[in-house]
Amino acid sequence: MFVLKLVLKNALRHKLRTILTILGMAIAITAFGFIRTVVTAWSAGVSATSDNRMIVRHSVSFILPLPFAYRDQLERVPGVSGVSYANWFQGQYKDPGDWKNFFPRIAVDPETYFALYPEFIVPPDQFEAFKRDRNACVVGAKLARDQGFTIGDVVTVEGDIYPGRWEFVVRAIYRGKDDKTDETQLFFHYNYLDERLRQEMPGRAGYVGWYILKVASPSEMPRIARTIDDSYLNSRAGTKTETEREFTQSFVSLSSAILESLTAASYVIIGVILIVLANTILMSARERTVEYAILKTIGFSRLHIAGLIIGEAFLIAILGCTIGLALTFPAAGALARQFPTFFPVVNVEVLTLLLAIGVALIAAGVAALFPTVRAFRTRIVDGLRAVG
């Protein structure tokens, strides 16, 4: 207890220096936690994928469509227990220059799509209303909050991929089964899109963007992928079949350079934390060389001296880490508010908190190592001679 009191008094002896060190630690920890949160948010879609879903897309590029006729053929592939399809629509909603107005707009088959994605929970009465109305849409709960959508609202979108003015009536609002589920999407009837294309652009009708497969056993996925891709190898629209995780990961990999840069920045921050803390502890230990010599003279052991140095380092590190972690949550919240659809799932993960705490504690231990060894090796007479 006496040593703890001395640790506290030593830390507060130079209040300004201690406060600035704690502040520097807090800023570094906040930056570390924020960057880690950005990286995990960027990859959130990968962790939310299912182990029993596969995606069939065009072998050349995701933007190229596949014939609607493939559906019946895919249903007959052994090991496939369910098939659905979807089509990227996009378009422009309100001001396209505002990130908040960018959210996925996808044409789907209501009956099969939501059966394959049970993580999208839609109230039964709303789902029935959605199925009855051909130009109806389902929006995510987060999207509804951000845009102020309510049941019965009309969402007007100016088409770009599919030109024209498109109106969708909000008939249902889905919520995710957990915090990893994307609640920022808008789904509408594929038939609404296809029927209008048949009237206005017949050459573009009868195609879908990609197929979603539900498989009976994940172990069968490699065989199913080979079977499907070999079947369409010489067709005009070849396929690339992959697991949902691989499909999602392919989009994340497009930003790999950014993610690697952010990860590297987080490592640099660890070095900053160490330098800031080590500088303070070294200065404090050097100033107290005489005091340590006197303490040794009156009977304090080397362990007591080590406790004073290490204790001060850990006290400053813990305070800085606590403040930094407390600031990480509002920083992550600001990111989610500023880019609600670009980062649909923003959570400060437990692993991020543990890493930040671990970094702070390791930095404290390393920062205290050299001054502790120096205090051990300094003889009493040499310490007393340091006066002046």
Language model features with spans:
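Peri-transmembrane interface segments
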Residues: V38, W42, E220-I275, S284-R286, ...
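N-terminal Sec/SRP start-transfer signal
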Residues: M1-A31, I310, D382, G388
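Transmembrane alpha-helical interface segments in multi-pass membrane proteins
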Residues: L282, V290-A336, L355, A363, ...
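Hydrophobic, regular-secondary-structure patches
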Residues: A26-R105, V122-D133, R145, P202, ...
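Conserved transmembrane alpha-helices of multi-pass membrane proteins
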Residues: F339-F370, R377, D382-G388
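Hydrophobic alpha-helical transmembrane segments of multi-pass inner-membrane transport and secretion
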Residues: R13-T40, S255-E291, F314-I323, A363-V366
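Hydrophobic secondary-structure segments that place a key small or acidic residue at a functional site
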Residues: A86-N87, D98-D109, F120-R196
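Small-residue transmembrane helix packing/gating motifs
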Residues: I55, G82, G91, V169-R223
